[in-house]
Amino acid sequence: MRRELLSKESSEIQGMFGRIAHRYDLLNRTLSLGQDVSWRRFVARRVAAIDHLRVLDVCTGTGDLALTVGGGVVGADFCLPMLERARLKARRLRQPLPLCAADALRLPFAEATFDVVTVAFGIRNFADLEVGLGELVRVLRPGGVLLVLEFSRPRGVLAPLLGWWVRHVPPRVGRWLSGDAEAYDYLPASVSTFPEGPAMCRGLESAGLTDVTVRPLTGGVASLYEGARPPEGER
């Protein structure tokens, strides 16, 4: 995989996702072997178990996770075509979903605004992971929870088969459906280079979170990371 394919600026990533917005849901279904729907439901159940009033879904994309979580969610994304897909989806479902055009590296919210912040399949696309994590923590209230759902490298006896699928099937399906070879090559490649497991947990702790955990899903095809912003006086 070419190094330059993975060394993208925010504007390049923004344009790439804009080009594939109309096929993005299908890409996630393909990349996840159809499991992304159940993963989002799992995250939504975790959100429901947390005492919360306001939830921010960063990199909301077409709104799948925000709409699964339900009321009290604000969806933020820097890709306008994605937000338009989310708006149409929410209207079709007759479900309110406030949307905000925002870069995850410069969120337009005051500190300690949200009880829960979620990110699904977006954090590996941050142009600067350290800065992005700092922003996610900044907008969390003390005691608030960050939930990050992200693709990871499979483990166990099925790892070779699952790894082959992630590397080869989505790019071929994506090129066939959209003709955008670069975008569909980038997305699986970004999974293989993104820090995961203990490395990602260390990044969350460095950003200021405590009680950081990781839970592999479906043989490690995806992972759910969780951490809390310390209450006032415990930092």
Predicted regions, residues:
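A short acidic, Gly/Pro-enriched loop at the edge of an enzyme's catalytic core
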Residues: 105-117
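C-terminal alpha-helical "lid/dimerization" subdomain adjacent to the S-adenosyl-L-methionine
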Residues: 11, 149, 153-203, 207, ...
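N-terminal, positively charged/glycine-rich alpha-helical extensions of SAM-dependent methyltransferases
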Residues: 1-23, 166
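Core SAM-dependent methyltransferase catalytic element
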Residues: 210-235
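Conserved alpha-helix/loop element of class I SAM-dependent methyltransferases that forms part
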Residues: 23, 32-52
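Class I SAM-dependent methyltransferase SAM/SAH-binding core
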Residues: 54-106
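A short glycine-rich, Lys/Arg-flanked "PGG" loop and its adjoining helix->strand segment in the class I
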Residues: 130-145
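Hydrophobic beta-strand segment of the Class I
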Residues: 24, 117-118
